[in-house]
Amino acid sequence: MADLNPITWWRHMLSLPNTSPAKTLIVALLVALTCGTAVSVTAIMLRPLQQKHHERERQARMQELLKSLPGMKDLIDDAGEVTLQCVLVELATGAIIEVADPLSFDQRAEAADPRANFDIPASADIAGIGKRSRRAPAYLMRWNGKLKRIILPVRGSGYQSMLYGYLALEGDLVTVAGLTFYAQAETPGLGTRIQEPAWQNLWPGSMIADDQGNLRIEVVRGKGTRPYQVDGISGATRTGTGVTNLLRFWLGDYGFGPFLKQLEIGKIDP
């Protein structure tokens, strides 16, 4: 009967000549097994450190991106020590789509791609954009685990051009933290003033809805008298109307409305 004692087997293997093919194969297998185990153990031990390193890199990249958005640097600096996150939102449902790198998503490219974009019903297209992407990025800022601010990309037709900007909301999802436009070609000296700090500074603290939750944000002619009204620019009524319409579109059912609703009722962890 064969001796199955491992010590006996080991002694027998060691007694083989070094030129023995069997001994060479066994030694090679043992070395490979030992090295593989060492690598696996090291990887497991280093994984928490690697994850922390990747998270620091992601936060730094996110902060750099958000601070590069026109008018957003002060909002981020003012928020203090926050955790930043970019998520990709399915606009129709408001659900967050899991992707490897949401920061690399090109919303304009998808909106222009007939294989991927969405035709907005004419009756709902108050922003005058015709088509939109099916997905859009949203930037979340958290402090101590609670949602502090959210930044949303917006666009829509003005008087003479397409207006591109970002709307920032406070964590209550009703109060405007800021509005900035980074691209437009409106009438010089009139509509172009939507990019001036003096006008953009009118937005923080305004409300997007009334006490009943109805979406009411608007740019009015003259002075605004309601919490959801912002002073218009003299001589740029049509541009102001365009701003009103694009904000209501992107905050509504065909924009980020479903996503904001999911955040509000807690179906998405803010």
Each predicted region: which residue ranges?
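N-terminal intrinsically disordered, acidic low-complexity segments at the extreme N-terminus
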Residues: M1-P6
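Flexible, solvent-exposed loop/hinge segments and secondary-structure transition points
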Residues: T8-P270
